[in-house]
Amino acid sequence: MAFVTVSHWTSTEISEEMISTANEKFIPLIMGVGASGVQMVRTGELSLCVVTQYPDAAAAQTAQAKIAEIREQVAQDFPMTMVSAHGGEVTGSSELHQIKN
């Protein structure tokens, strides 16, 4: 069963440069430790969350030591603080796939 983690972050600033760096540097690092998907979601002017999908709980557990290192690096590189992190097995989901003309 798929597993998802969500980490909540606050910052003193969120610039386009920070977002670009996160997309180019940190998302590939997260994907490289076994994630099957990751999204950064801006939840406020100075807050965001990172939603990471894994194929299963075992993959998520295996990745956690490296994820902790990545989170530490984010906090060093940016004026950001992780407020909380949660995770659990996916109990239901749906996706809408749009057909491009």
Give each language-model segment a name.
Residues M1-E72, Q76-N101:
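Short S/T/G/P-rich N-terminal loop/turn motif that feeds into the first structured element of a domain
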